[in-house]
């Protein structure tokens, strides 16, 4: 039971929802440079399984690591934290 809690959980923004049951989530993290101490922003895109096709472009979502679902999908959608406002 504790191994489920060891899985990585990230919060990111949906940048693509064109695939069926899959969204691409951009996760931004900050790391401190060892020598200079400056915070540097890193970003990475993760393909995420969205069973109900509920996440839309621009939504802020929480994703969790899971077993490999396809050649590129290793995460699943946990919840939609904030829905995007389309003007």
From Swiss-Prot:
GO biological process: translation
GO cellular component terms given for this protein: cytosolic small ribosomal subunit
Keywords: Ribonucleoprotein, Ribosomal protein, RNA-binding, rRNA-binding
Sequence intervals crossing the membrane: none
Gene3D superfamilies in alphabetical order: Nucleic acid-binding proteins (2.40.50.140)
Upper classification of the organism: Bacteria, Bacillati, Bacillota, Bacilli, Bacillales
Record's function text: One of the primary rRNA binding proteins, it binds specifically to the 5'-end of 16S ribosomal RNA.
Subunit relationships: Part of the 30S ribosomal subunit.
GO molecular function terms noted in the UniProt entry: rRNA binding; structural constituent of ribosome
Pfam family, one: Ribosomal_S17
Presence of the UniProt keyword rRNA-binding in the record: yes
InterPro entries xrefs: NA-bd_OB-fold, Ribosomal_uS17, Ribosomal_uS17_bact/chlr, Ribosomal_uS17_CS
Gene: rpsQ
Protein name in the entry: Small ribosomal subunit protein uS17
UniProt similarity note: Belongs to the universal ribosomal protein uS17 family.
């Amino acid at each position: 039971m504790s191994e489920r809690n060891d899985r990585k959980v990230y919060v990111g923004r949906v940048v693509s929802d064109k695939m069926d049951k899959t969204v691409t989530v951009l996760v931004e993290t900050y790391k401190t440079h060892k020598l200079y101490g400056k915070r540097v922003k890193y970003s990475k895109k993760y393909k995420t399984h969205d069973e109900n096709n509920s996440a839309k472009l621009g939504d802020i979502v929480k994703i969790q690591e899971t077993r490999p679902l396809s050649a590129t999908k290793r995460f699943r959608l946990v919840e939609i934290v904030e829905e995007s406002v389309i003007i």
